[in-house]
């Protein structure tokens, strides 16, 4: 197969993000102000003791650092062949779970040529067993070709396709019951953040997952602020960390302390090779879900290797 020299990333369109952080996080009501204030005070007081107990990687979740690459609806056979070649030659840190999600049409091509070091995910799956559902991909089909993960609740599925929280929760439950791991996406739109509804929106989306899923054992939560995708506004590490802390506390209060401790919460807002190291330093950022930058092999490798920013002295 011929290998194209053109970068797959060059097919992406839309405005590039600027470097300045966007400060728009406000609580939606006094009651939330009080609860979040006490929450953050509590977590600040306990952070030093939590860090002292982790000798290898400073991470709130107990699993490996997790980096997913979502290729979305991009690529041709030749361009994907070049991307896979770049990934196969990349040197990746060993203590990271790495997953990529190619377009469905190219899953077999990627499976046959990508290193076993990197797992392959579906970008979506149907809510039940396959059948007369034109254009959909079933969990059974993903399993049949050896896939172990699926991305559900991505902002483009929510806000472009129109999937609601409850439907996404049912999809997650079915995928988990059939043995797939789920990358469960949550996140607020720009107008929701500016209206002070960031936490409300994330909690509602989390609740839809919690109400439906049988277990959190094979779930990775991806916080994906929609306002940080193609808007020219970038979340600072501190803004991302604040929401991750709140998500973990919600899991503790509404699911269990064990789930809150073990669940990896990754960040998915315009992550690239230039900001991944600083983001990775935040304790509750357990990895990344990467869009455009995952289409460039060397840059994606840089993001995977950002785990080194998280390592602390024993």
From Swiss-Prot:
Keywords: Calvin cycle, Chloroplast, Isomerase, Plastid, Transit peptide
Active site: 154 (electrophile), 224 (proton acceptor)
InterPro entries reported for this sequence: Aldolase_TIM, TIM_sf, TrioseP_Isoase_bac/euk, Triosephosphate_isomerase, Triosephosphate_isomerase_AS
Other facts: In plants, there are two types of TPIS, cytosolic and plastid.
Enzyme class: isomerase
PANTHER family: TRIOSEPHOSPHATE ISOMERASE
Oligomer and partners: Homodimer.
Binding site for substrate: 70, 72
Gene Ontology molecular-function annotations: triose-phosphate isomerase activity
CDD domains named in the record: TIM
Protein name, entry field: Triosephosphate isomerase, chloroplastic
Organism, scientific name: Fragaria ananassa (Strawberry)
Compartments where located: Plastid, Chloroplast
